């Protein structure tokens, strides 16, 4: 198998290429520079992972290359984006649509006790998972 990456920015694509080469994974990786909203992959893929501000706008094109029964994952940083993505997936008939919040917060650890830090410096992000139906 191979991982196909689509990066809209050439500078990010070059950074990704350096990281993949450094990790020794080049034989298993294919880089495309372009916009996932309209790029032609020329192949069907088993899974898609998107990290972009408006992933719901890419779903029409994702449907062209994500095989039936394939898995979808998306990362978005705010709740309004979760709504757009989840609604977009449901509108297309995707199954098992799940949205999860990932919260990172510091813990106070002392002998005899562990509790969350009272400082409210937390970072959150949302992961959305779904499966394309086996038949459209």
Language model: regions and residue ranges:
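S-adenosyl-L-methionine
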Residues: 4-55
């Amino acid at each position: 198998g191979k991982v196909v990456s689509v990066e809209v920015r050439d500078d990010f694509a070059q950074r990704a290429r350096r990281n993949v080469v450094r990790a020794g994974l080049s034989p298993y990786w294919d880089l495309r520079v372009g916009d996932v909203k309209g790029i032609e992959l020329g192949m069907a893929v088993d899974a898609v992972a998107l990290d972009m501000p408006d992933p719901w706008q890419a779903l029409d094109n994702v449907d062209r290359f994500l095989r039936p029964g394939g898995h979808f994952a998306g990362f978005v940083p705010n709740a309004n984006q979760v709504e757009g993505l989840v609604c977009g997936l449901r509108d297309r008939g995707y199954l098992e649509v799940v949205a999860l919040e990932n919260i990172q917060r510091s813990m106070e650890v002392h002998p005899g006790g562990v509790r969350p830090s009272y400082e409210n410096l937390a970072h959150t992000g949302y992961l959305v998972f779904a499966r394309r139906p086996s038949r459209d």
